[in-house]
Every structure is written in C-alpha cells, then in structure tokens.
Amino acid sequence: MENEEIPEFLSPKEEIVYWRELSKRLKQSYQEARDELIEFQEGSRELEAELETQLVQAEQRNRDLLSDNQRLKCEVESLKEKLEHQYAQSYKQVSLLEDELARARSIKDQLHKYVRELEQANDDLERAKRATIVSLEDFEQRLNQAIERNAFLESELDEKESLLVSVQRLKDEARDLRQELAVRERQTDGTRKSAPSSPTLDCDKTDSAVQASLSLPATPVGKICDNSFTSPKGIPNGFGTTPLTPSARISALNIVGDLLRKVGALESKLAACRNFAKDQASRKSYTPVNLNSNSSSSVLNSSGVKYSHAGHTSFFDKGAVNGYEPPGVLGSRPPSPPGMLPLSV
C-alpha cells in the first residue's frame, strides 16, 4: 500500500472518498491483524504452556533417563568388572586346562612308549618262554632218559646183587659138593680095596661120565640161577641117606664145572670193574679244585652217588670178599672186557 501511487483527483470529494475507503481498508486490515495477533498470542500462550509442560515432562524424563543412565553405567561397570574377573578366571582355567592337556599328552606319549616297551618285553618274554618250554621239554626228555637209565642201572645192580648172592650160594654148594666128592672118593677107594675085580668097570663109568660132561654144552646163566635156587631140593648135600645116581652125579659135575667157569668170569668182570672204578677215582683225585664251595659240592655229590643206594649195602658187604666196591649208579657204565659176559645177564 505504501508503494501504491496516489491518483490524481478531479475533485475534493473524490479525494475524500478515496481516503475514507483507504482508511476503512486499513482499519479492517488492522482489525484483522489485531485479531490475528490476539489469536496468535492466545495460541502462543497455549503453546508456551504446553511446551512448558512438555519441557517439565522432558526434564523429568531426562532426569529419569540420567538416573537410568547412571544406574546402567554402574551396572555396566559392575558387569565389566565381572566380565573381566570371569575372563581372568576363564583364562586361568584355560591355561590350567592347556597345561593339563599338555601333561596328559606327554603322559599319553609316555604310556604309548611304555606300552610299546611292554609289548617288546612281552614278545621277548614269550620268546624266552617258548625257549624255556623247549629247553624244559628237552630237559624233561633227558631227565626221563636219565631216570630210565637209572632204573636200568638199578635193575642191573639188583641183578648183580642177586648174582653175587647166587655166586656165594653156588660157592657154598660147590664146597659141599667137593666135600661130598671127597667122601665118595674115599668110599670108592674103600670099595676098590674090598673088591679088586670092579675097578675097571668103575673107571670106565667115570671116564664115560667125564667125556659126557665135556661133550655137553655150557649151561646158560639163567638156568644156573634157577638151578642155584632149586639145588638145595634136587641135589643132596652128602649127609643124607639117599645116594647119588651116576646120571645125577654127572649132572652135578656138569653144573659145578659151569658154575666154576661162570664164577671165574664174574670174578674177572668184577676185577675189571674195580680197576675201572680205581682209575675213575684217581682221575677225579687229580682234577684241580677252584673253589671251596665246588669242592664241598663235589664231595656231597660223590657221597650222594656213593650212598644213593644205602639199602643195598648189605649185599655189597657180602660181595666185598672179592675186594670189589661198586661205583656210583648214576655214573657211566664201564665197558665190558672182550670175551666176558655182561652183568645184566
């Protein structure tokens, strides 16, 4: 409106009308502006009150939020401390578990190594066990052979003792038969003196008996033993009342000759065994002795070998007449001289 140009008036009335209308327009605009101002003031007051209430609420909310923030900060600090403490504990626990894991792995490696060593030792022990079993079987076999040999030697020793007994008995019987022969010869000499016509017949009979005895084969040793045990019943001792028949006398002479030959063979056999035992004893006496314990053990072993058959010493006491002392049973069997009968016969 300020920029509006004032028109030119033709008359004062037109000017007055113009200014009146202008004033009316300005007054109306003023009224409108005033109303708007009043309305704006009222609206601004309401808005201010509302903003104040909102500000109060915002301040209250801000205070609440600040308190909540402070509380949350405290909680965060506490949680952070707890987290740090928990992290430290977990780190310590993890480090401890790692150490334990390292120790467990080292122990596991050691155990694996120990298991391998045990397996190797077990294999060695199994091989040693198999070798021991084989050696034990070999030892048992040798022990059984030694036991069998010992039993065989004991049986030979028993047979030898029985042979010594039978030889002594046969010696007694031979002595009795010699005495009986001497008595018979004296009787025959008396009968020859009383009857001079019969000597030729008796000489022929005795010559035929001697030739028959020389022509007969040698009696086996088993039969000799049987005859030696049965002779007291079948052969009279010269003091009985029953006289000997010529056939019985021939058989008795044959048995006596065989027995004398066997006794001589046995005596030579025993002498050879005695010489062999003396040689063995002399060889043992010349062996060097290194330790006292070895000497004592050898003495004990020799004494054990010598007295291992103490139950048979009575028969050897009887056989000691020939000067024979038997060697150890467990020792090696002496070789038989050529042309001699074995002791096991």
UniProtKB/Swiss-Prot annotation:
Residues 334-345 have a biased composition (Pro residues). One of its GO terms (cellular component) is kinetochore. GO terms for biological process: cell migration; centrosome localization; chromosome segregation; establishment of chromosome localization; establishment of mitotic spindle orientation; lysosome localization; microtubule nucleation; mitotic centrosome separation. Phosphorylated in mitosis. Disulfide bonds: none annotated. Keywords: Coiled coil, Cytoplasm, Cytoskeleton, Microtubule, Phosphoprotein, Transport. Residues 19-190 form a coiled coil. Residues 182-192 have a biased composition (Basic and acidic residues). GO terms for molecular function: microtubule binding. Gene3D superfamilies: 6.10.250.1080. It is found in: Cytoplasm, Cytoskeleton; Cytoplasm, Cytoskeleton, Microtubule organizing center, Centrosome; Cytoplasm, Cytoskeleton, Spindle. Residues 182-206, 326-345 are annotated as: Disordered. The keyword Nucleotide-binding does not apply. It holds the Pfam family NUDE_C. The keyword Coiled coil applies. It comes from the Eukaryota. Transmembrane segments: none annotated. PANTHER family: NUCLEAR DISTRIBUTION PROTEIN NUDE HOMOLOG 1 (PTHR10921), NUCLEAR DISTRIBUTION PROTEIN NUDE-LIKE 1 (PTHR10921:SF0). Belongs to the nudE family. Required for organization of the cellular microtubule array and microtubule anchoring at the centrosome. Positively regulates the activity of the minus-end directed microtubule motor protein dynein. May enhance dynein-mediated microtubule sliding by targeting dynein to the microtubule plus end. Positively regulates lysosome peripheral distribution and ruffled border formation in osteoclasts. This is Nuclear distribution protein nudE-like 1-A. It comes from Xenopus laevis.
